[in-house]
């Protein structure tokens, strides 16, 4: 067992203590009328706040914002927690026990600040509020690692969030001195084009002044890139503004076309108007918001890079599909040569995302935000990405051997050969020491029917045979259920 597997196993063992509730528990919290059993030694070891609370001569009163001290008799019984909500408190405990957390509300779950019943809650107001509440709790209880993780989550959210939510995060980032998040949000607000009188309804005057200063600097910077004509000093500024507005209009038209499955219009925009699909983030948008058929048609245009890193985090479309736990999207991206080993700015691969979701899902009783995941889809996504990664790894090894033997004339092999993939799949499942295989087949499949779906009834037989070769056992009932 590798060091990574050992650490993952240790993390899951500790998290299991939290899930089992009363097992070896020596402290009970009451949060919003619900009891949460925990363990003093773990909380004290992981949080300075809890260490002082349990062991200090003068414990903090932070669990009760009314300021009432918790006496010894109360600390030996049920401890009321009024400073945070149940969901946020449980997310924080999960991180304290395991070092991992997923700050995402349940998919399609009715949320207080989200009226869309089909929302994935990836960047809506409800998702932003949950992340902000988690960040506040992490800072309050002194869990700095969780605070940093939540800041990264918020930085990813605000790229697609509404401008109102961006301003909400902007205020929180200033209040808690989060400079990187402040920079991201302030630039987004500056680029929004909202006039100061509108910003004044949401932001204090000093922040509006900083936003206007950013706009001025940005305008001067862009103007300096173009030669000046002294007879008309305002000409270039107006030209740049018009060009930016034109690009925004193109992107909005492109998204409307994708929403209506009109890929032909997108093609005309690429050929006739010079639309850059990568800069417009067409593929990430289609993966997250459109159907598999639209994504496939967009890829077949040949104008979008399937491995293009988007946003400040550098996520590729395959990263997004992995986060969505969508085997349809994962399959079509891999069919068009998406790289399963590509990393984000933080060094995370699509396989890492699926591994984390797998370990989190196994303990969904302690993770309110992950109960929506369908085990069959998660298992299939993990299997597809693992198989593709194994094939690429072997191909790279073969290419290196050929290069060492000066056999440069050999032709490149297909990325997903039928027999080759089948061999990799069976070799992978015969390795009993592999942590991912144990998680997928012993746990994810333990409480669910082995009923999976066909990925693309309209695709050609070649692609279907490729995926069947990855895992023949998964498709023995493939006509009985559709995703």
UniProtKB/Swiss-Prot annotation:
Biased segments, Basic and acidic residues type: 456-465
Domain BTB: 25-105
Compositional bias of kind Low complexity: 398-414
Membrane-protein topology: Peripheral membrane protein
GO aspect biological process, one term: regulation of DNA-templated transcription
Cited SMART domains: ANK (SM00248), BTB (SM00225)
Record note on disruption phenotype: Altered morphology of stipules. Altered morphology of flowers. Production of abnormal nodules that develop roots from the apical part of the nodule. Altered abscission of senescing leaflets and of petals in developing fruits, even after complete pod senescence.
Keywords: ANK repeat, Cell membrane, Cytoplasm, Membrane, Metal-binding, Nodulation, Nucleus, Repeat, Ubl conjugation pathway, Zinc, Zinc-finger
This protein's GO CC annotations: cytoplasm; nucleus; plasma membrane
Binding-site list for Zn(2+): 114, 119, 121, 124
InterPro entries (UniProt xref): Ankyrin_rpt (IPR002110), Ankyrin_rpt-contain_sf (IPR036770), BTB/POZ_dom (IPR000210), NPR5/6 (IPR044284), NPR_central_dom (IPR024228), SKP1/BTB/POZ_sf (IPR011333)
Subcellular location: Nucleus; Cytoplasm; Cell membrane
PROSITE patterns given in the database record: ANK_REP_REGION, ANK_REPEAT, BTB, ZF_C2HC_NPR
Positions of the UniProt region annotated as Disordered: 395-435, 450-483
ANK repeats: 249-278, 279-308, 313-342, 346-380
Example of a GO MF term: transcription cis-regulatory region binding
Domain notes: The BTB/POZ domain mediates the interaction with some component of ubiquitin ligase complexes.
Role this protein plays: May act as a substrate-specific adapter of an E3 ubiquitin-protein ligase complex (CUL3-RBX1-BTB) which mediates the ubiquitination and subsequent proteasomal degradation of target proteins. Transcriptional co-regulator involved in the promotion of leaf and floral meristem fate and determinacy. Promotes normal stipule growth and development. Required for the abscission of senescent organs, probably by regulating the cell wall disorganization in abscission zones (AZs, e.g. pulvini at the base of leaves).
Family membership noted in the UniProt record: Belongs to the plant 'ANKYRIN-BTB/POZ' family. 'NOOT-BOP-COCH-like' (NBCL) subfamily.
Name listed for the protein in its UniProt record: BTB/POZ domain and ankyrin repeat-containing protein COCH
Organism per entry: Pisum sativum (Garden pea)
Name of the coding gene: COCH
């Amino acid at each position: 067992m590798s060091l990574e597997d050992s650490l993952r196993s240790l993390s899951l063992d500790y998290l299991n203590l939290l899930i089992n509730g009363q097992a070896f528990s020596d402290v009970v919290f009451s949060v919003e009328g619900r009891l949460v059993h925990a363990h003093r030694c773990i909380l004290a070891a992981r949080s300075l706040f809890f260490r002082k609370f349990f062991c200090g001569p003068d414990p903090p009163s932070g669990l009760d914002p009314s300021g009432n001290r918790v006496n010894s008799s109360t600390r030996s019984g049920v401890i009321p927690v009024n400073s945070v909500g149940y969901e946020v408190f449980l997310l924080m405990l999960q991180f304290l026990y395991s070092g991992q957390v997923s700050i995402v509300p349940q998919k399609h779950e009715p949320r207080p600040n989200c009226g869309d019943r089909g929302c994935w809650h990836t960047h809506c107001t409800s998702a932003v509020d949950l992340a902000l509440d988690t960040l506040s709790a992490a800072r309050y209880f002194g869990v700095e690692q969780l605070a940093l993780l939540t800041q990264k989550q918020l930085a990813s959210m605000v790229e697609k969030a509404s401008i109102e939510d961006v301003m909400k995060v902007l205020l929180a980032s200033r209040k808690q001195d989060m400079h990187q998040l402040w920079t991201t949000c302030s630039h987004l607000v500056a680029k929004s084009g909202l006039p100061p009188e509108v910003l004044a309804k949401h932001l204090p005057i000093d922040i509006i002044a900083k936003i206007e200063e950013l706009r001025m600097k940005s305008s001067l910077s862009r103007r300096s890139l173009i030669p000046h004509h002294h007879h008309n000093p305002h000409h270039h500024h107006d030209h740049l503004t018009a060009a930016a507005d034109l690009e925004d209009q193109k992107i909005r038209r492109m998204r409307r076309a994708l929403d209506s499955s009109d890929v032909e219009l997108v093609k005309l925009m690429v050929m006739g108007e010079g639309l850059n699909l990568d800069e417009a983030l067409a593929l990430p948008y289609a993966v997250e918001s459109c159907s598999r058929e639209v994504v496939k048609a967009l890829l077949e245009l040949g104008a979008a890079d399937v491995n293009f890193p988007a946003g400040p985090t550098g996520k590729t479309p395959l990263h997004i599909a992995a986060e969505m736990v969508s085997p349809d999207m994962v399959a079509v991206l891999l069919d068009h040569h998406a790289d399963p080993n590509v990393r984000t700015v933080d060094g995370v691969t699509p396989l890492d995302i699926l591994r984390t979701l797998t370990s989190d899902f196994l303990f969904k009783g302690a993770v309110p935000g992950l109960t929506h995941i369908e085990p069959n889809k998660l298992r299939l996504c993990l299997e597809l990405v693992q198989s593709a990664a194994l094939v690429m790894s072997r191909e790279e090894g073969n290419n290196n051997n050929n290069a060492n033997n000066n056999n440069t004339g050999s032709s490149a092999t297909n990325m997903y050969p039928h027999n080759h993939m089948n061999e990799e799949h069976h070799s992978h499942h015969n390795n009993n020491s592999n942590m991912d295989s144990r998680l997928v087949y012993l746990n994810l499949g333990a409480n669910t029917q082995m009923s999976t779906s066909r990925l693309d009834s309209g695709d050609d037989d070649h692609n279907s045979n490729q995926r069947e070769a990855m895992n023949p056992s998964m498709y023995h009932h493939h006509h009985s259920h559709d995703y």
